[in-house]
Amino acid sequence: MKRGMREAIIGNPVILQGMLYLVLKLMSLKFVLNATFRRLIKNEYGTFDRTIALQTRDKSIKLYVVFHDGRMTVRRGVPAHADVTIVYRSPQVIREFATLSPEEMLNYLLTNKLTFRGNLSHLSRFAYILNNFAPGKKGRPVKDGAAPAAGGHAPAVRTGLISRRGELRSTPGDRVKYLREPYLQAYTIGDFPGLRAQRELHFTARPCVCAERARLITQYFLDTGFEYDRSGNRRQPVLRQAQALKYLLTNKRPIIRENSMIAGTTTSRDVGVIIYPEGHGITLWPELRTVSGRKLQPYDIEEEDREILDKQVFPFWSDRNVREYARLSNNFPRYQELDERFVLYFMWKTVALSHTVADFPRLLAHGVMPIIEDAARRKEEAQDEQKRGFYSAIETALRGVLIYAEHLEQEAQRLAVQAGNADRYRRLADMLHRVPAHGARNLDEAVQSLWIFWVALHNESTNAGLSLGHLDRWLQPYFESDMERLSPGKEQEAYVFHALELIGNFFFRCQDHLPLVADVGNKLFGGSSSDQAITLGGVDRSGKSAVCDMTYIFLKVTEMLTVRDPNMNARYHPGVNSDEYLRRLVEVNMVTSATPSIHNDAAMIQSLKSVGFREEDAREWCATGCVEPTIPGRHFGHTNSMMFNMVAALEMALNDGVHPLMDEQIGPKTGSIMEGAFAAFEDFYRAFERQLRFLAYQTIDYNNSLGLAHQDIRPTPILSSLFEGPLDRAKDLTEGGALYNTSGVACIGLTDIVDSLMTIKKLVYDEKRTDFATLRKAVDANFEGYEKLHTMIRNRVAKFGSDEREVNLLAQRVIDTVFDIFYTRTNYRGGHYLVGFWSMSNHVAFGTLSGALPSGRLRYKPFTPGLTPENVRGVDLLSSIRTIAGLRPERMPNNIAFNVKVAPDSRDTHEETVNQITAYAKSYFELGGMQMQFNIVTTETLRDAMEHPENYRNLLVRVSGYNAYFVELDRDLQLEIISRQQMRV
């Protein structure tokens, strides 16, 4: 049969449906004939009794599958109430599926070739079932910690690590008391064998899925009940959660890693991927057989863990995770369906609400016992049953933390007897006998106390964006008290060495876990770790410099280790913090190539004051996750509640409410360009604003419904115990217990919006060089056949970052518009929505799902990251600095990410380069710029890293707010970073 005829036959929907029906029927026989396959849908834990429908958008193909009591039945048509309906854009898409693995099917969700209605958990299980029928798709053999690091590359041991060091020296300034040379240039990573060993493990151990947490909490609820206890009484969510956490922490394996100065681990693996089935854990279901073999960020998984997740854990949580609870509670809302198209916005509450910072100084000063005693007293005094339940929850959860510490103490005592280095384990046991139950007396106890509580928090809340705050100033009193007891000279110098080693150990403890990212998420959040932000410097509550000895200890550790997490952020207050401090921040950026991010303290404080934060509280702000501000212990802001694609609103305004990729009427009809709408630019701007408002309100409604789901599914009693407000109000943080209760928005695509609007305004309305219909046609054609118009757009229209007054005013107008839209709405806890302009890696993901734009950006190309000008003619570093610094911080209270890619001149010395970059940074901050982050690396180096990744294992880059290892990024994201304008200094 000729190929054309064969294609025509297979392409016939009737024939294609018949073929698909036959394939599914053959599958159904497998469940009858093979007990192993039958266990996929019926086993000792229960049965998969669901209906899955499959149809094309034009309904030319309609089939459905019924799973019931261990059998699979295939039928024609689509039932009225399927649990999941999979909709294919066309019959051609169904044909393509023959060559895809089931987890690759989910990647089709990104491009909207595949959409679905119904329960995503059931779709994930169906994909896993299909995966078991796919030949040759199994992952690699599993052995925890034995293989190379994530990213798909396999460097030999001790190769590929870039080693650099600072050269500059300084004298004490700000509030430095003991460091005679604050830059600490006498020390290198070579002086710390233990840190070198841990760094080697970090870059060679493959992440491994850890089912410990998921298994324990699931077993607890199977034994005791979830919605109702075994007596039939409805369980109070916060108390239920506390009891589960106590069970988890009581039964969690106590581990003290070799070479570590700190006891306790987040997971039972060297580098563990934690599963939160009540959050987004079920997204791993389709990949349980293949995740260890995927190209980007592969995870090992043991067969026992795979079995327990598939058979017990994921089925239990299929309807009890936050996403599905919100769906069922709101009758399958449209705003949730739009989120699951991945093009318009991404809602982080489906994963976490952990972007916040606790009151760690309270923990360090007093320990857990006073909080337990306070909760017990309040419980006795409370008259209301719900309040008594809340206080009991605080007490119960914190006792779980102490039980975990007690088990670590016992493990240290055991190792002191059985292992070598008995003195080390005895010291750990002595510390664990005191902390975190009581206040810390020295730096070692403070770090140990902090770490145990940090482990507990990550077993309560998703390891995404939960941040550590001002560790330099919070640990400084313990450093000072230790130093005061030592003689100047060798004793104090030895202690500085010890402090560096201890903080280095803490950094690697923070690296012992990774967030779960499904393969489809690698395009959305490429290379991101847990983003545990630490904030240094700035001013204290009274407005005085907070730069201290520990600030420089942390900076030196950052320089020596050059790791992506913790995500280091530094506050710089012009006129208060010293030039020597700013110069050191720049030098560490130059050595590491990408960290820390630097923030203008004055601008951020003013921005927070303008939206209702008290000045004293605003002065204590610290970065959360990426760059977002949080007031530690007072402000529960979920600062990354959503990633909002503003460009989608522009595309919808250009298409009368239709989104081109989705090919559906999404927003309101606001006027057809092809029919002569929009007589003036203001008419089109109003259409854009209306589409923007429509999308924003969808996200707000969804965020609020997800927040209510968190109240019922996963309250946070441990986190609430270290906040001001919850105990006084007898309210969990998820219910509005904190003093400040905002929600943070990340607005993506501002540069692309401004440049597009300027093109429309200038060429269509002001200069009339083209008409709107022609411009729309050019955009639809990706400018093919409209090359002259494209050249005119790129060369004649002033761009964002050029410091042209008209462009700057338009940029501020767009910022004001989106600020007003969000700020005037309240969240489920009664707080405001605060906007910021940063993008993680979603500027690439959203860009690859979007068409060409009037700015001249071509189809499927990334948007510009954060609040960064595009790499075009007429935009240089100075004009960019003036443009960004001229925007009003008061309208961007969730902060910005201004990415600057710097290529040092090879003719300049190290000191000259540092001084030049420092001068630019200082000018930017003095002009009022909010934030600046660097990639100090040449384009040539990045291209070589793409070709020879084995030589660049620790090449650090700033994406947009967070750090990543360049060689672990998706190719599209690598190319986006390479394409950024390279500024010469």
Descriptions of predicted regions:
Residues 412-425:
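Short, Lys/Glu-rich amphipathic helical modules
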Residues 392-403:
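Extended non-globular scaffold/tether segments
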Residues 99, 111, 418-420, 484-485, ...:
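Charged, alpha-helical scaffolding/interaction elements associated with membrane systems
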Residues 1-158:
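Feature captures hydrophobic
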Residues 77, 124, 138, 417, ...:
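Short linear functional motifs in flexible/disordered or boundary regions
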Residues 160-394, 423-985:
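Conserved catalytic cores of very large enzyme subunits
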Residues 106, 406, 472-473:
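Amphipathic alpha-helical repeat elements characteristic of tetratricopeptide repeat
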Residues 403, 407-410, 414:
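Extended, non-transmembrane alpha-helical coiled-coils
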